């Protein structure tokens, strides 16, 4: 396993063998290794990566004291984002190492995790794709929920009932997407298809956990 943190820049078109491919361009890294975890130490094999380096003044405003102490102990400059990524062999990394987009190669399959666009408070039709009521003369409801349960028994609404509420801003992972282009010099990775989230949203790219055969 290997991975990197980045920001979604947007989508564009790349032509490959005469075919037009819609790709998402991601500004990946540079990320700094802040901590190593090993199974031998009673934990699991993983590394913690810092992304988007901060000045000391900005770090004091944006980070909590425990996080600042963590960077001080590792002798690494403070970073805005701190994420953990599972790896097979943590001994391949050292605290302070810098990881860039060059860890991935063109044609490789990856899993991309992002946070979907927040849509705010929405109704059941938009949130859960309900059909709604009849749009005819005499109908008393059109975009409402309908029945939500029985009357006397159980005389309550069951937990988990699909109802209006906040929609979006959820962590979503897209599996087995192809790396089309890698520009390690500029820290750019072009991934086939769409990636969850808005432009400028945080994404985590990992080597595919269950690649297609």
UniProtKB/Swiss-Prot annotation:
* GO BP term, pick one: translation
Instruction: Write the protein's name.
Output: Large ribosomal subunit protein uL3
Q: Name one GO cellular component term.
A: cytosolic large ribosomal subunit
Function, as annotated: One of the primary rRNA binding proteins, it binds directly near the 3'-end of the 23S rRNA, where it nucleates assembly of the 50S subunit.
Q: Which InterPro entries match?
A: Ribosomal_uL3 (IPR000597), Ribosomal_uL3_bac/org-type (IPR019927), Ribosomal_uL3_CS (IPR019926), Transl_B-barrel_sf (IPR009000)
- UniProt entry tagged with the keyword Transmembrane helix: no
What's a Pfam family this protein contains? Ribosomal_L3
Keyword Chaperone assigned: no
Task: Write the record's keywords in alphabetical order, separated by commas.
Answer: Ribonucleoprotein, Ribosomal protein, RNA-binding, rRNA-binding
Annotated source species: Kosmotoga olearia (strain ATCC BAA-1733 / DSM 21960 / TBF 19.5.1)
Q: GO terms for molecular function, please? A: rRNA binding; structural constituent of ribosome
Q: How does it assemble?
A: Part of the 50S ribosomal subunit. Forms a cluster with proteins L14 and L19.
> What NCBIfam families is this protein classified in?
L3_bact
| UniProt record similarity statement | Belongs to the universal ribosomal protein uL3 family.
Q: Which PROSITE patterns match?
A: RIBOSOMAL_L3
């Amino acid at each position: 396993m290997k991975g990197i943190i980045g920001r979604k820049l947007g989508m564009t078109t790349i032509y490959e063998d005469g075919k037009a491919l819609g790709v998402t361009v991601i500004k990946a890294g540079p990320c700094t290794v802040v901590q190593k975890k090993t199974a031998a130490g009673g934990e699991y094999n993983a590394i913690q990566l810092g992304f988007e380096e901060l000045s000391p003044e900005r770090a004091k405003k944006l980070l909590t004291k425990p996080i600042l102490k963590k960077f001080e102990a590792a002798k690494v400059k403070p970073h805005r984002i701190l994420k953990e990524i599972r790896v097979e062999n943590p001994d391949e990394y050292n605290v302070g190492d810098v990881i860039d987009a060059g860890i991935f190669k063109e044609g490789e399959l990856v899993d991309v995790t992002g946070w979907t666009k927040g849509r705010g408070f929405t109704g059941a039709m938009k949130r859960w794709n309900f059909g709604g009521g009849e749009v005819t003369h005499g109908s008393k409801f059109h975009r409402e929920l309908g029945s939500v349960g029985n009357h006397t028994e159980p005389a309550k609404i069951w937990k988990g009932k699909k109802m209006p509420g906040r929609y979006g801003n959820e962590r979503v992972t897209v599996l087995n997407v192809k790396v089309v282009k890698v520009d390690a010099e500029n820290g750019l990775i072009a991934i086939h298809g769409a990636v969850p989230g808005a432009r400028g949203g945080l994404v985590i790219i990992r080597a595919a956990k269950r690649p297609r055969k």
